[in-house]
Amino acid sequence: MSLSTIICIGMAGSGKTTFMQRLNSHLRAEKTPPYVINLDPAVLRVPYGANIDIRDSIKYKKVMENYQLGPNGAIVTSLNLFSTKIDQVIRLVEQKKDKFQNCIIDTPGQIECFVWSASGAIITESFASSFPTVIAYIVDTPRNSSPTTFMSNMLYACSILYKTKLPMIVVFNKTDVCKADFAKEWMTDFESFQAAIKEDQDLNGDNGLGSGYMSSLVNSMSLMLEEFYSQLDVVGVSSFTGDGFDEFMQCVDKKVDEYDQYYKQEREKALNLKKKKEEMRKQKSLNGLMKDLGLNEKSSAAASDNDSIDAISDLEEDANDGLVDRDEDEGVEREYTFPGEERTKGEVNENSAPDLQRRYQEAMQQVGKTASSETAENIAKYIRN
């Protein structure tokens, strides 16, 4: 069985790090210890042993001092620095894939620093292109007892799913404090969610959501997210007691199968399309360069000239084809003979035939004029092209 990657994402205070600790303990109890990676550079202490820890190579406070950044800017910069070595991280994980079945990754609590940053996309894409990857979106169940907060969390989960395009499991954490049954019901029953909105209005009066713009907006969003809910696996867990982690791992196995069946093919299509577009862009740039240099026009003009003429000497040879053959070549018996200079002054013989020399000279002048004219025209055409 190939190694699968679980990327844990959640808002600050959702219990993400505690979830990682309990998941690590659960898998070790099952005799399948995971390969653990910590990507939170600002955490002071992690309650689990990490095989790769971003804090070993990047000092968060030094980044703040050297680059004069605030907390969130330092987290983004730390992730940027770490992402430059992501190929080495992938290589290390690949070397251990025969010893581990799962790789679990903890991310910063400032969720936007990871999800919406370029470094977060690089890290996610690198793992997703090498291993079956699943997103575990951790939700604080007690905080989501309000319909407004619940809807906001679901919209955030939807945006993460759209951004990563990876299988997602919505994990309702802290079920030891508040059961997640109400959330599962809201996701599957629209009327139940409407009743919760009305109840919120009754409890909070004018501050509730039972009427007006907010009520209409929340109802519309719940209808819109109905298709989104159908693609999710939802599980309730308690990081404090350990309840629900068996169900969570079953969901992971299911999502890994979905990754191999659907997401992997879609990702390959997307990569091939991207590669094809890049090749087309390079070819277009090359054609533009050739056009700017004028190489295409010159080559096409030379090709057309080669089809019609090869050289100017060929024109002259073709023009000479119109010359009149000598009488000897034609086998005609000469009608007169003049010795010396008299060859050009003789009289016509007894048959009173036309002066053959005059006819010969006229023919030569006419043929020479025609050949020269054709040669001049062809030369002019060659120069113009």
Curated annotation (Swiss-Prot):
Enzyme Commission number: 3.6.5.-
Cross-link Glycyl lysine isopeptide (Lys-Gly) (interchain with G-Cter in ubiquitin) mapped to chain: 369
Keyword Hydrolase: yes
Record-linked Pfam families: ATP_bind_1
Modified positions (Phosphoserine) in chain numbering: 304, 308, 313, 352
Ranges annotated as biased composition (Acidic residues): 317-332
Main location per the UniProt record: cytoplasm
Subcellular location(s) of the protein: Cytoplasm
Residue spans of biased composition, Basic and acidic residues class: 333-348
Family assignment from sequence similarity: Belongs to the GPN-loop GTPase family.
Role this protein plays: Small GTPase required for proper nuclear import of RNA polymerase II (RNAPII). May act at an RNAP assembly step prior to nuclear import. Promotes sister chromatid separation during anaphase.
Name under which the protein is recorded: GPN-loop GTPase 1
